């Protein structure tokens, strides 16, 4: 296992991303990358994605979120980076 410290990616995904399987798709990609966290629908129509793991794997997830192969339609993704602040087990849809 790498000695690299874990990071936390918080991504706000804008577009038609609710009711189209986007959170399920995000969870599947995150688990494939070995990340922990969650994807949550927000009342304003966005999806909040919080992922923790290596910087490299979180950057890969961010690239997938910004790519064109997601369910629905992603108009933009706003990402914020920080140190992993808490222990999260698994990756969940909220």
Curated annotation (Swiss-Prot):
The keyword Ion transport does not apply. Keywords: Hydrolase. It is an enzyme of class 3 (hydrolase). The keyword Hydrolase applies. The active site is at 23, 41. Signal peptide: none annotated. Its EC number is 3.6.1.7. This is Acylphosphatase. Residues 8-94 form the Acylphosphatase-like domain. Belongs to the acylphosphatase family. InterPro entries: Acylphosphatase, Acylphosphatase-like_dom, Acylphosphatase-like_dom_sf, Acylphosphatase_CS. The gene is acyP. PANTHER family: ACYLPHOSPHATASE (PTHR47268:SF4). It catalyses: an acyl phosphate + H2O = a carboxylate + phosphate + H(+). One of its GO terms (molecular function) is acylphosphatase activity. It holds the Pfam family Acylphosphatase.
